[in-house]
């Protein structure tokens, strides 16, 4: 039988980099979450991902979505997965061992 992990995943997809950075900033300020990655989907779409406890991820994604909407018409989607299945973990970015903000910034902008 497959297993699940207790750490939640929050995702915000935006139109453009500026709303993505605004959302990432708001998410990390709003709750105790880790910025674990971003993905340039194509066509100007960017997805930003955070991990943490379910309640914190929920608060962070709400704050990030609100911040993204204030920038303009940047919000495409916001979603939370409470307990990510172990089979899904292999396609997600690795979580940094410590909450090094330099790592987060470097991986957001690279």
From Swiss-Prot:
GO biological process terms on file: carbon fixation
Location of the protein in the cell: Carboxysome
InterPro entries per record: Bact_microcomp_CS (IPR020808), BMC_dom (IPR000249), BMC_shell (IPR050575), CcmK-like_sf (IPR037233), CcmK/CsoS1_BMC (IPR044872)
Domain BMC: 8-93
Pfam family, one: BMC
Mutant phenotype after disruption: Required for growth in ambient air.
Gene Ontology CC, one term: carboxysome
CDD domains associated with the record: BMC_CsoS1
Biotechnology: Expression of 10 genes for alpha-carboxysome (Cb) proteins (cbbL-cbbS-csoS2-csoS3-csoS4A-csoS4B-csoS1C-csoS1A-csoS1B-csoS1D) in E.coli generates compartments that resemble Cb, contain RuBisCO and have its catalytic activity, showing it is possible to make artificial, functional Cb using these 10 genes. Cargo proteins can be targeted to these organelles. Artificial Cb assembly in E.coli requires csoS2-csoS4A-csoS4B-csoS1C-csoS1A-csoS1B-csoS1D (but not the gene for carbonic anhydrase, csoS3).
Swiss-Prot/TrEMBL domain comment: The tight homohexamer forms a small pore which is positively charged.
Subunit-structure text: Homohexamer with a small central pore. Interacts with the N-terminus (residues 1-136) of RuBisCO (CbbL).
Function (record text): One of shell proteins of the carboxysome, a polyhedral inclusion where RuBisCO (ribulose bisphosphate carboxylase, ccbL-ccbS) is sequestered. Assembles into hexamers which make sheets that form the facets of the polyhedral carboxysome. The shell probably limits the diffusion of CO(2) into and out of the carboxysome. There are estimated to be 540 CsoS1B proteins per carboxysome.
Family: Belongs to the bacterial microcompartments protein family. CsoS1 subfamily.
PANTHER family from the UniProt entry: BACTERIAL MICROCOMPARTMENT SHELL PROTEIN PDUJ, PROPANEDIOL UTILIZATION PROTEIN PDUA
Protein known as: Carboxysome shell protein CsoS1B
Source species of the chain: Halothiobacillus neapolitanus (strain ATCC 23641 / c2)
The gene coding this protein: csoS1B
């Amino acid at each position: 039988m497959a297993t699940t992990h207790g750490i939640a995943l929050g995702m915000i997809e935006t139109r453009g980099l500026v709303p993505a950075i605004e959302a990432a900033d708001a998410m990390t300020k709003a709750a105790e979450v880790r910025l674990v990655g971003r993905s340039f989907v194509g066509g100007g779409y960017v997805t930003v991902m955070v991990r943490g406890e379910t309640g914190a991820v929920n608060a962070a994604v709400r704050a990030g979505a609100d911040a993204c909407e204030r920038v303009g018409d940047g919000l495409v989607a916001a979603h939370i997965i409470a307990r990510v299945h172990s089979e899904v973990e292999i396609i997600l970015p690795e979580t940094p061992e410590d909450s090094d903000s330099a790592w987060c910034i470097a991986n957001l902008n690279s």
